[in-house]
Design a protein with these regions (language model features):
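Bacterial N-terminal signal peptides that target proteins for export
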Residues: 2-14
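Structural microenvironment flanking redox-active thiols in thiol-disulfide oxidoreductases
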Residues: 84-136
Length: 196
């Protein structure tokens, strides 16, 4: 009797573990990454007042094109290779956004001097905004909490992209949970084209 029950119990245990694993996988798949969770599509982006790489101050309205603005929130153009690669891709993609009435801008905690160096090195023609004390990053709820004050990375955001209409209303948010990955600009362009 004992030898008959043993394989049955083993099979039951394996089936139970398999069902548990499937349930766990389904539950994990249901949890989607929500970048900037305090800001939803349809919300107005908090007011922006920031200086660019030339020391010129910009508001959200001044940054916007006829149809809107693509605002890229980046970690650093000084030491983050993923941000630098994204910046280079943005330089290549800017004309496509301009053609549909969208301006582009980036925002980081980098100093104005660092942003000026980035402009010269990567030949940008759009505003690279300095977020003083990461005030906007904090207001948007995207401050990377992994770093403590005093760490050189303190003040960086979780990177992502806002597609804003010409009234500063969020029409799309694009981000990857892994900071090393960035949304493809073809997807950003599609989101911008959908703005009426």
């Amino acid at each position: 009797m004992k030898s008959f029950l043993q394989p049955l119990l083993s099979r039951s245990l394996l089936i139970g573990l398999f069902v548990f694993a499937l349930a766990s996988t389904a539950s994990a798949a249901d949890e989607t990454f929500n970048w900037a969770p305090s800001l939803n599509v349809g919300d107005a982006l908090p007011a922006i007042s920031a200086v660019d790489q030339d020391g010129n101050e910009h508001s959200l309205a001044q940054l916007s094109g006829e149809n809107g603005l693509i605002l890229i929130m980046s970690r650093s153009f000084d030491w983050c290779p993923f941000c630098i690669r994204q910046l280079q891709q943005l330089v290549e993609s800017e004309a496509q956004f301009n053609a549909i009435g969208f301006n582009v801008a980036t925002m980081t905690y980098d100093s104005v001097a660092t942003l000026k160096e980035a402009e010269e090195e990567y030949e940008t023609t759009f505003p690279l905004l300095h977020d003083e004390d990461s005030a906007h990053i904090k207001a948007m709820g995207i401050l990377n909490m992994q770093y403590e004050p005093g760490n050189r990375a303190y003040g960086i955001p979780y990177p992502g992209i806002f597609v804003l209409d010409n009234n500063g209303v969020i029409r799309a948010k694009l981000a990857e949970e892994d900071y090393r990955m960035r949304p493809d600009f073809s997807l950003v362009l599609e989101a911008a084209q959908a703005v009426e």
